[in-house]
């Protein structure tokens, strides 16, 4: 039960950090409800340091947050699935899931369904393994960072848009 408390305490930190939800009263209330339910304000919750927050912060330094955010969101969806039958906190979980849906999936049900579908693929199934390896060569190029093939053109004149004389060109100075 202590690990569950720790996880939900970090849920508060992570959700606030990811969504900037300081002005969203109902979301904060629901997170506070979960904290109270799991007694996550207890001193033993902090033992061993943060579970997810430090990892997220270290990835933000590099600017590659989408990868780790998707793993963290996946973690929370699994956590919420494990807590699904608990009626005392179901409304809080639904509110937080709705906020994640808007912020992480841009309110796209298709993206949410694809995400959930990916998290439920049984990786121990030999048929799934064969299909995944077969598709690997096609998938890998889409996973690498995109290099900008087009370079931005620079303006030939100064900020004001006026004509600027070219150095060492007598015709432009006359």
UniProtKB/Swiss-Prot annotation:
<keyword id="KW-0732">Signal</keyword>
<dbReference type="GO" id="GO:0005615">
    <property type="term" value="C:extracellular space"/>
</dbReference>
<feature type="modified residue" description="Pyrrolidone carboxylic acid">
    <location>
        <position position="24"/>
    </location>
</feature>
<keyword id="KW-0964">Secreted</keyword>
<dbReference type="Pfam" id="PF00714">
    <property type="entry name" value="IFN-gamma"/>
</dbReference>
<feature type="signal peptide">
    <location>
        <begin position="1"/>
        <end position="23"/>
    </location>
</feature>
<keyword id="KW-0341">Growth regulation</keyword>
<keyword id="KW-0325">Glycoprotein</keyword>
<dbReference type="GO" id="GO:0051607">
    <property type="term" value="P:defense response to virus"/>
</dbReference>
<comment type="function">
    <text>Type II interferon produced by immune cells such as T-cells and NK cells that plays crucial roles in antimicrobial, antiviral, and antitumor responses by activating effector immune cells and enhancing antigen presentation. Primarily signals through the JAK-STAT pathway after interaction with its receptor IFNGR1 to affect gene regulation. Upon IFNG binding, IFNGR1 intracellular domain opens out to allow association of downstream signaling components JAK2, JAK1 and STAT1, leading to STAT1 activation, nuclear translocation and transcription of IFNG-regulated genes.</text>
</comment>
<dbReference type="GO" id="GO:0005133">
    <property type="term" value="F:type II interferon receptor binding"/>
</dbReference>
<dbReference type="GO" id="GO:0005125">
    <property type="term" value="F:cytokine activity"/>
</dbReference>
<dbReference type="GO" id="GO:0006959">
    <property type="term" value="P:humoral immune response"/>
</dbReference>
<feature type="glycosylation site" description="N-linked (GlcNAc...) asparagine">
    <location>
        <position position="39"/>
    </location>
</feature>
<keyword id="KW-0051">Antiviral defense</keyword>
<comment type="subunit">
    <text>Homodimer. Interacts with IFNGR1 (via extracellular domain); this interaction promotes IFNGR1 dimerization.</text>
</comment>
<keyword id="KW-0202">Cytokine</keyword>
<protein>
    <recommendedName>
        <fullName>Interferon gamma</fullName>
    </recommendedName>
</protein>
<keyword id="KW-0873">Pyrrolidone carboxylic acid</keyword>
<feature type="glycosylation site" description="N-linked (GlcNAc...) asparagine">
    <location>
        <position position="106"/>
    </location>
</feature>
<dbReference type="InterPro" id="IPR009079">
    <property type="entry name" value="4_helix_cytokine-like_core"/>
</dbReference>
<dbReference type="GO" id="GO:0002250">
    <property type="term" value="P:adaptive immune response"/>
</dbReference>
<dbReference type="InterPro" id="IPR002069">
    <property type="entry name" value="Interferon_gamma"/>
</dbReference>
<comment type="similarity">
    <text>Belongs to the type II (or gamma) interferon family.</text>
</comment>
């Amino acid at each position: 039960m202590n690990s569950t408390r720790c996880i939900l305490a970090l849920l508060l930190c992570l959700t606030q950090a990811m969504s900037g939800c300081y002005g969203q009263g109902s979301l904060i209330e629901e997170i506070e409800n979960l904290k109270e339910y799991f007694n996550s304000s207890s001193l033993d919750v902090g033992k061993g340091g943060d579970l997810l927050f430090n990892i997220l912060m270290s990835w933000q330094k590099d600017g590659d947050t989408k990868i780790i955010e998707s793993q963290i969101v996946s973690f929370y969806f699994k956590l919420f699935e494990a807590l699904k039958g608990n009626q005392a906190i179901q409304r809080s979980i639904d509110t937080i899931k709705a906020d994640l849906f808007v912020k992480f999936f841009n309110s796209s049900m298709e993206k949410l369904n694809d995400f959930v579908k990916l998290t439920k693929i049984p990786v121990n199934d030999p048929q799934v393994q064969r299909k995944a390896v077969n598709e690997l060569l096609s998938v890998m190029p889409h996973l690498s960072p995109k290099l900008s093939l087009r370079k931005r053109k620079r303006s030939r004149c100064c900020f004001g848009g006026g004509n600027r004389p070219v150095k060492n060109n007598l015709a432009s100075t006359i």
